[in-house]
C-alpha cells in the first residue's frame, strides 16, 4: 500500500464542511470522488481537521492509501488533481509518507486563524471571508482576553459538547494581529472541540464591545455554566491555517 499525504486549501462557503455526508457537497466527498476515479479503487480520505460548514482552510492536511502508484509521481498527481478538482479546492503539496502516518492522529499541533473586518462600511469582497463588525472594537481588550485563553483550561463552556468526552485542552498560542481594519486572531493547540474557536472569538468580541467583562470570562474558564458566554462567531471568518507534525 502507498500512503499519500496532501496539503490542501479550500474556500468553505459552498461546502457542508469537510466530513462526507450523504447528498451534500463536502471536501472529503469531492476528494474521494476524484481520487477513486484516478486510482480505480475506493479511496478513503482522512483529514487533520473536520472543518464545519462555511469554514475555510489554508493548510488542511489529508492522507489516503492506495494499492499502488498507478503511474503517478507526486508531481504528476499534484497537477492532475488540480485539473480535476473543483476550483474552490486547491492541492498545495503531494508527498508519499511512511505507512504509519495518519493525518489526524499524527498531528502534534493545529493552528486556526479568525479574521474580523472592523469598519463602519461593509467590504463587498471580504464578506465571505471575514466577520464584519461595524462598531469600533477595543483592541486592547481583545489582547487581554486572548491571553486568558492561553494555557490549560476546560473548554466545556466554549464548544458544542454532545459527543465530546475530553474538554481539557492546553492552548499553546492565543494572540491577535492587527493590520488596519483587519483583526486576525491566531490560536494553536493539539486539538480543538467542535465550534471551540468560534465560541472563543465570539467571547472576545463580546468583551471588546463592552457587553461582557474580563472577570466574567475568567469565571467561565474556571467552572461549568448552563448558559454560553456568547454565541459563536460566524463560520466564514475561520480558517484552518496549519497543521504541525
Curated annotation (Swiss-Prot):
EC assignment: 5.4.99.12
Binding residue positions for substrate: 112
GO terms (BP aspect): tRNA pseudouridine synthesis
UniProt keyword Protein transport, yes or no: no
Catalytic residues (positions): 52
A UniProt-annotated Pfam family: PseudoU_synth_1
Catalytic activities: uridine(38/39/40) in tRNA = pseudouridine(38/39/40) in tRNA
Annotated GO MF terms: pseudouridine synthase activity; RNA binding; tRNA pseudouridine(38-40) synthase activity
EC class of the enzyme, as a word: isomerase
Keywords for the protein's UniProt record, in alphabetical order: Isomerase, tRNA processing
Keyword match Membrane: no
Entry similarity comment: Belongs to the tRNA pseudouridine synthase TruA family.
Function description: Formation of pseudouridine at positions 38, 39 and 40 in the anticodon stem and loop of transfer RNAs.
Oligomeric form and interacting partners: Homodimer.
Family annotation (HAMAP family): TruA (MF_00171)
Protein name per its UniProtKB record: tRNA pseudouridine synthase A
Organism: Dictyoglomus turgidum (strain DSM 6724 / Z-1310)
